[in-house]
């Protein structure tokens, strides 16, 4: 291995899963593991086999299916843990046993009720036992960030002598600051005589928001493995996020001494979305690298800069992580340059419209609606302001019966006519969608559906957002209500009205 290669050790399936309200199923874990393999992760920590039969089987199945990544299993410094880890891993093409014990005074005295010599003896014995199964053994000094430095140096030296090939230095509770954590790694390299016989790894938690910073500071002092998770999943405030350290290393090679990883960065975004969907853990909109706002621009000044040169406000190209869609949001903060560019993208020559007039009407619509979409802007070109927000479809009444056969009855006003339909579906939301499709005689495909709480308490409002695809174009709808089914119906009707206006625009174009 080249000295500037940073090994990426992903622990989404072990440490990340510990943050979830419920355990993942075996097939869900396998799906994530295969995605991590496709991402180019070097080491996948698949689980903690001794913790449950389900975890054992999951590690075993992942070990049998993944061929290009090393599969790792966690164990305490106990014979039964190490033996169980081996039994789960032995079918793997490449595997690692990862054993650990706490080394801080606080943990030794209050949790383990043992002194340092006892802990040292247990660690060495565990490493030797793990080495009887594989040459690839990792040892972690739990709570290393709060371990007296002389004790930590002595533990690391003896763990390497016992046969550990990777020594992991965790900031278990996210307590240290980057300069402080970097100094710990620096001292280890200066004081541990056999440090060159092992790879030094770091595992940083995010309790003070320092996980990524601590990990990067550590590689500058000699660490060559970073333990991380997709989307920063993990106990409490989470772990170092894989996408953050990988893109920091890629983006700041000038400062980070030419370090690199083998991660296929173009797969980062889809892997992030997959993990979010399987774990049911939403990605915060402002999350670095993969959040929905990470490459979004709504300020007119920022949009103007990006339109002239993306590097003015984007240090990473969205395509670098696999995002290929436009994230320029049209809001009341957008300037004329943004509106002109959007119209050009829609195929309109600037000689065919008055930009000042369109922009004035755009601002009125944006103040009323919030976010304006390209089809809304196009409607401004052909429909008068009084009519572009005129809704052909109005939801009048809605009733739903749940149970074995979910059924919805929807009444809608179309112009002056009332139309009612009743439909079944695979759940009440689909039943409502089927009713609206039948009433409108339009058959779009539902591409995205999300629910977010807008307030708290028993009378909390929920916001439903939907994306419908019709004739190759996506249309967005939003609904808000204390009743999620009603909010869903509102969102569907909103999107259907956008489709209607789009069809009306097409008619005007053909006239």
UniProtKB/Swiss-Prot annotation:
It comes from Campylobacter jejuni subsp. jejuni serotype O:6 (strain 81116 / NCTC 11828). GO terms for cellular component: cytosol. InterPro entries: 2-IPM_HCS-like, 2-isopropylmalate_synth_dimer, AIPM/Hcit_synth_CS, Aldolase_TIM, LeuA/HCS_post-cat, LeuA_allosteric_dom_sf, LeuA_bact_synth, PYR_CT. Homodimer. The keyword Cytoplasm applies. This is 2-isopropylmalate synthase. Residues 394-511 are annotated as: Regulatory domain. It is found in: Cytoplasm. Belongs to the alpha-IPM synthase/homocitrate synthase family. LeuA type 1 subfamily. Mn(2+) binds at residues 15, 203, 205, 239. Its EC number is 2.3.3.13. One of its GO terms (molecular function) is 2-isopropylmalate synthase activity. Its cofactor is Mn(2+). It catalyses: 3-methyl-2-oxobutanoate + acetyl-CoA + H2O = (2S)-2-isopropylmalate + CoA + H(+). The keyword Transferase applies. Residues 6-269 form the Pyruvate carboxyltransferase domain. GO terms for biological process: L-leucine biosynthetic process. Catalyzes the condensation of the acetyl group of acetyl-CoA with 3-methyl-2-oxobutanoate (2-ketoisovalerate) to form 3-carboxy-3-hydroxy-4-methylpentanoate (2-isopropylmalate). Pathway: Amino-acid biosynthesis; L-leucine biosynthesis; L-leucine from 3-methyl-2-oxobutanoate: step 1/4. Keywords: Amino-acid biosynthesis, Branched-chain amino acid biosynthesis, Cytoplasm, Leucine biosynthesis, Manganese, Metal-binding, Transferase.
């Amino acid at each position: 291995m080249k000295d500037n290669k940073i090994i990426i050790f992903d622990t989404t399936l072990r440490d990340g899963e510990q943050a979830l309200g419920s355990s993942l199923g075996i097939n869900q874990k396998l799906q994530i593991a295969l995605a991590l393999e496709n991402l180019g992760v070097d080491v996948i920590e698949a689980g903690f086999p001794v913790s449950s039969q389900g975890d054992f089987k999951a590690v075993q199945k992942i070990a049998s299916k993944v061929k290009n990544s090393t599969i790792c299993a966690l164990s305490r410094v106990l014979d039964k843990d190490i033996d169980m880890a081996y039994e789960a891993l032995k079918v793997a093409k490449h595997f690692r046993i990862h054993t650990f014990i706490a080394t801080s005074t606080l943990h030794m005295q209050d949790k383990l009720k043992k002194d340092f010599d006892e802990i040292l003896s247990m660690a060495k014995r565990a490493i030797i036992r793990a080495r009887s199964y594989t040459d690839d053994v990792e040892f972690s000094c739990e709570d290393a960030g709060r371990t007296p430095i002389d004790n930590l140096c002595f533990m690391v030296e003896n763990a390497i002598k016992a046969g550990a090939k990777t020594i992991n230095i965790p900031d278990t509770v996210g307590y240290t600051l980057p300069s402080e954590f970097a100094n710990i790694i620096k001292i280890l390299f200066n004081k541990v005589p056999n440090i060159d016989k092992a790879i030094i790894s770091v595992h940083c938690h995010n309790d003070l928001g320092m996980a990524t910073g601590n990990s990067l500071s550590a590689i500058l002092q000699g660490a060559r493995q970073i333990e991380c998770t997709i989307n920063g999943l993990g106990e409490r405030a989470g772990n170092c996020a894989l996408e953050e350290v990988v893109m920091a290393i890629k983006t700041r090679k000038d400062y980070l001494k030419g370090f690199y990883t083998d991660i296929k960065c173009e797969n980062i975004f889809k892997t992030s979305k997959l993990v979010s969907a399987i774990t049911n853990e939403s990605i915060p909109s402002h999350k670095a690298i993969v959040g929905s706002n990470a490459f979004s621009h709504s300020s007119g000044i920022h949009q103007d800069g990006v339109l002239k040169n993306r590097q003015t406000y984007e240090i990473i190209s969205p395509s670098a992580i696999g995002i290929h869609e436009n994230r320029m949001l049209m809001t009341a903060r957008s300037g004329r340059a943004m509106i002109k560019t959007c119209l050009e993208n829609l195929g309109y020559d600037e000689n065919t419209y008055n930009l000042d007039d369109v922009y004035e009407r755009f601002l009125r619509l944006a103040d009323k609606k919030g976010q304006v979409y390209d089809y809304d802007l196009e409607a401004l070109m052909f429909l008068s302001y009084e009519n572009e927000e005129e809704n052909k479809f109005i939801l009048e009444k809605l009733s739903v019966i749940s149970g074995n056969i979910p059924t919805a009855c929807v009444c809608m006003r179309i112009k002056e006519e009332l139309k009612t339909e009743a439909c079944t579906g695979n759940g009440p939301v689909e039943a409502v969608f089927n009713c609206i499709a039948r009433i409108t005689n339009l058959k779009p495909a539902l591409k995205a559906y999300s629910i977010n709480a807008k307030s708290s308490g028993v009378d909390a409002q929920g916001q439903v957002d939907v994306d419908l695809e019709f004739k190759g174009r996506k249309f967005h709808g939003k609904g808000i209500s204390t009743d999620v089914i009603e909010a869903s119906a509102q969102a569907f009707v909103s999107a259907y009205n956008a489709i209607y206006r789009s069809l009306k625009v097409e008619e005007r174009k053909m006239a």
